[in-house]
């Protein structure tokens, strides 16, 4: 038997098995940084609030994770969890809007793209809204606008500081004009909150764009942003095509907006809770924060 025949027979009797594929990174044990590609033990990454230990890149977090990062344990009381979007326009693109809503509700466990409620931050009571980009890109429709408006009105009546963590692609196109009117509705509610000289701090995370940027995201007394967050109204390519000129590489980043006076501070996520607590305490010591009686603003929300 030739050597060639021996190898051929051996291959038949001992077939070569395919190498086992590498273990998926998404199994939960390790996480890969979207910026530098570093592999980090997920437990360590979560301990650092989903900020890369190598390059400082801020990975996206869910609204539940954000609430846990900011609110003291066992103090969170959610509001208006029963609100669900309807489909007045009977909108359909590749699938019906109502089917798309149900799909995202199943994927995220949320009713819509924002969670609202009250709780304590470092022992300080406040009203908090947290947008979740996982739910249709954090787009603002009727439910998001209504929940935020009720939250703002609740904060006004109860003289609470207000924090809204923004993460959105803008207005929800599937609701047409009904989504656009939420910009005016939330802005009007914030004007009442401001008239009562109460503190409102929006926190702009990646990304904050479109109708959210053009409304409540930019109406704060102090506007904070996470490092390297994309913040703007229209997309970069749209702006370049409209202006017909090349934009700076850092255009529409938190750092660019800070240098041009559109945000007041860039705060790394691990320092956010401490920074918010400091700002709330400073505002509480100001005479104007306690000398004004609450305005008679109707409050539609009831804490569940």
UniProtKB/Swiss-Prot annotation:
ZnF endpoints (C4-type): 33-55
Boundaries of every CoA carboxyltransferase N-terminal domain copy: 29-298
Source species, domain of life: Bacteria
Major place of residence: cytoplasm
GO biological-process terms attached to the record: fatty acid biosynthetic process; malonyl-CoA biosynthetic process
Residues annotated as binding Zn(2+): 33, 36, 52, 55
EC number(s) on file: 2.1.3.15
Keyword Lipid biosynthesis: yes
Pathway in which this enzyme or protein is active: Lipid metabolism; malonyl-CoA biosynthesis; malonyl-CoA from acetyl-CoA: step 1/1
UniProt catalytic activity: N(6)-carboxybiotinyl-L-lysyl-[protein] + acetyl-CoA = N(6)-biotinyl-L-lysyl-[protein] + malonyl-CoA
Short name of one Pfam family: Zn_ribbon_ACC
PANTHER family xrefs: ACETYL-COENZYME A CARBOXYLASE CARBOXYL TRANSFERASE SUBUNIT BETA, CHLOROPLASTIC
Role according to the record: Component of the acetyl coenzyme A carboxylase (ACC) complex. Biotin carboxylase (BC) catalyzes the carboxylation of biotin on its carrier protein (BCCP) and then the CO(2) group is transferred by the transcarboxylase to acetyl-CoA to form malonyl-CoA.
UniProt subunit comment: Acetyl-CoA carboxylase is a heterohexamer composed of biotin carboxyl carrier protein (AccB), biotin carboxylase (AccC) and two subunits each of ACCase subunit alpha (AccA) and ACCase subunit beta (AccD).
Family indicated by similarity: Belongs to the AccD/PCCB family.
Protein name from the UniProt record: Acetyl-coenzyme A carboxylase carboxyl transferase subunit beta
Lineage: Bacteria, Bacillati, Cyanobacteriota, Cyanophyceae, Acaryochloridales
Gene: accD
């Amino acid at each position: 038997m030739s050597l060639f025949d021996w190898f051929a027979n051996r291959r038949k009797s001992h077939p070569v098995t395919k190498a086992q594929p590498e273990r998926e990174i998404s199994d939960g044990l390790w996480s890969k940084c979207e910026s530098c590609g570093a592999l980090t033990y997920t437990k360590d990454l979560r301990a650092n609030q989903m900020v890369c230990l190598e390059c400082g890149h801020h990975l996206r977090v869910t609204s539940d994770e954000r609430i846990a990062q900011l609110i003291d344990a066992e103090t969170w009381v959610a509001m208006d969890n029963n609100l669900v979007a309807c489909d007045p326009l009977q909108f359909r693109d590749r699938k019906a809007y109502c089917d798309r809503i149900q799909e995202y509700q199943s994927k995220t466990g949320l009713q819509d793209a924002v969670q609202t409620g009250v709780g304590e931050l470092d022992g300080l009571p406040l009203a908090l809204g947290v947008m979740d980009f996982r739910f249709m890109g954090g787009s603002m429709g009727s439910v998001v606008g209504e929940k935020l408006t009720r939250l703002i009105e609740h904060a006004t009546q109860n003289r609470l500081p207000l924090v809204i963590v923004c993460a959105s692609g803008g207005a929800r196109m599937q609701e047409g004009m009904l989504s656009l009117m939420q910009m005016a509705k939330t802005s009007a509610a914030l004007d009442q909150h401001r008239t009562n000289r109460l503190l409102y701090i929006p926190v702009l995370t990646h990304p904050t764009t479109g109708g959210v940027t053009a409304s409540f995201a930019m109406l704060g007394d102090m506007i904070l942003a996470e490092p390297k967050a994309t913040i703007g109204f229209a997309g970069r390519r749209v702006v370049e095509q409209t202006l017909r000129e090349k934009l700076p590489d850092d255009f529409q980043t938190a750092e660019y907006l800070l240098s041009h006076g559109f945000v007041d501070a860039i705060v790394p996520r691990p320092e956010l809770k401490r920074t918010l607590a400091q700002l709330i305490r400073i505002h509480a010591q100001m005479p104007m924060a306690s000398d004004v009686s609450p305005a008679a603003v109707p409050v539609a929300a009831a804490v569940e």
